[in-house]
């Protein structure tokens, strides 16, 4: 993965979701990773915000707030992905010299 040259450090944009509609859309569905179900599922962006940011240089808020942009995650898989995203973000900062 090569980040878009000139991209600044990622800072999560709250407006990118998950929105109430996105969260509602994943309830009662199995986790896209492990198949588990939790009483409250997490709306996971199919294209993680941090990845989109370093690939394109920004986040497409309209795309990322649509219900089709998310998939269900259980809490365990969501937490695991959060750690992976943090490692990814640090690597992108090193590559970009940030």
Per-segment meaning from a language model:
Residues 1-98:
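Catalytic toxin/effector domains delivered as secreted proteins or via bacterial secretion systems
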């Amino acid at each position: 993965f090569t980040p878009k040259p000139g991209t600044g450090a990622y800072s999560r944009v709250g407006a990118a979701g998950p929105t109430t509609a996105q969260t509602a859309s994943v309830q009662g569905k199995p986790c896209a990773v492990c198949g588990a179900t939790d009483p409250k599922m997490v709306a996971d962006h199919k294209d993680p915000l941090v990845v989109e940011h370093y690939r394109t240089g920004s986040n497409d808020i309209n795309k990322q707030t649509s219900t089709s942009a998310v998939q269900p995650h259980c809490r365990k898989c969501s937490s695991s992905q959060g750690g992976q995203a943090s490692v990814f973000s640090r690597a992108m900062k090193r590559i970009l010299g940030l």
